[in-house]
Amino acid sequence: MHTEQMAIRSILAQVRKAVRGKDQVLARVLLSILARGHILLEDIPGVGKTTMALAFSKALGLRCQRVQFTPDVMPSDLTGFSVYNQERRGFEYHAGALMCNLFLADELNRATSRTQSALLEAMEEGQVTVDGVSRPIPQPFVVIATQNPVGAAGTQPLPD
């Protein structure tokens, strides 16, 4: 058996310890991660979407950040922000949640369109922009987003 196949089987075995009964979904998610694609999982709350994302992060040794999206999550929570430092007499950048390798966007369709837009920039361009300055996101960078079924309380459709 090839080394790559053994590595894939090992990763899936580790994730299966946390998530049971979703072998086809696990294989597709791993394929997307290895291809550096982004993943959108739709299902009702409480079926293990977050557990699966965290298990992949651990199995792959990726730095993971998770944001539970609600209408009050601001774009700066994702991108980071600048704060004035009086001692240095200048602004300092404080990194946001997107400065990681695997970003778990939990219940993305509960976020405002402005916050979703900040995430889309990171996904499409591999960077965040704060105060007109673009900052690269660490690579590899993969987003696993979850959404509740459209029409569930407090949700809004994601842009195409």
Which residues does each PLM region occupy?
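Canonical AAA+ ATPase core
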Residues: 85-90, 107-118, 123-160
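Short loop/turn elements that form and flank the Walker-type P-loop nucleotide-binding site
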Residues: 27, 34-36, 47, 60, ...
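Pre-Walker A (pre-P-loop) alpha-helix and adjacent loop at the N terminus of AAA/AAA+ ATPase modules
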Residues: 2-47
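Hydrophobic anchor at the beta1->P-loop junction of P-loop NTPases
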Residues: 41, 104-105
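Walker A/P-loop
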Residues: 33-71
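Helical mechanochemical/support elements of P-loop NTPase systems and associated helical scaffolds
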Residues: 4-7, 11, 22-25, 48, ...
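Conserved alpha-helical scaffold flanking the Walker A/P-loop in AAA+ ATPase domains
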Residues: 28-31, 84-104
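P-loop (Walker A) phosphate-binding loop of NTP-binding proteins
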Residues: 44, 78, 146
